[in-house]
Amino acid sequence: MAVIGVSTTHDHHPANVIYNKNHLRYPVQTFAVNPKGGQLNRAPVYRSVGQIETAVDLAVIAVRSRFVPDVVAQCIEKGVKGAVIISGGFAETGDKDLQKEVTDLAAQADFPFVGPNCLGIYSPDAVDTFFLPGERIIHPKKGNIGFVSQSGGVLVDQMVKFAGQGIGVSAAVSIGNKACIRETHMIDWFEQDLGTRVIAFYIEGFECREGREFIKRAHTCTKPIVVLKAGKTARGIAAASSHTASVAGDYRVFSQIMAQHCVAEADTEYELTSFCEALSCYPKGSSGHIGIVSLSGGHGVVAADACGHHGLDIPEIAEQ
């Protein structure tokens, strides 16, 4: 893995954080890249990704946005298989042309990338491109939840919630502006991943017709899918646009379509956690007939009301 944009003078630079923790804690060969060259922690800093003699599977790009097209071109020329673009300053701040330049360049070369404006990928025991020091983030254990989020902050907070409930993840991916890799691609990947049983999403919005494609793909997926949809109000829609350049659309329509196509919708981050935990243990639905056993009469009443609210049947118990 090449980490492009490291600093030889500023130890807390995001690229340095990514380089250091992967170099020291994960089984990945890591290379530091900066046009000035030099050394970082007694290891050489390459002036370009092209100078690295070893084949590179992944490039983590953490340079100023205006330099990203040139760096992507260098990665393509080197034969790098894909990238995570951490850098912000693209469509989310109004520079759609710069984002399109990167996207077009990558599309012509069939070069996949995550981002821009994202944290990237966390895969337990494999790789971590989040630019947060270990003491500032709680990593859940390895498990069977695949989580995809447009927001890096929501992803980090959700990882804390998963860890608190003892829920493990197979991988967590922050896709940011999703200029290349999108939700449908992640469904494809997680569906074939043997270590994933549940696929969860935090979604702010879609481009034109993208929501329809997501629902169609989710409906055919063989694994349960849970969605936490943001941008439900006028204020939320405006916030989504400035955050990840997303078009939130009509929430009520999308919510109804999700229900029609068996996509579980969580109203809050806490519901998302509970849904993932339940589906990771019981991925296949029941007939809807529920029996309630409770030491507390009051909790039995609450459970009965919840079943009624969600259309679940509680059969009468036979006298014998």
Where are these regions (language model features)?
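Catalytic-core regions of core metabolic enzymes
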Residues: 1-320
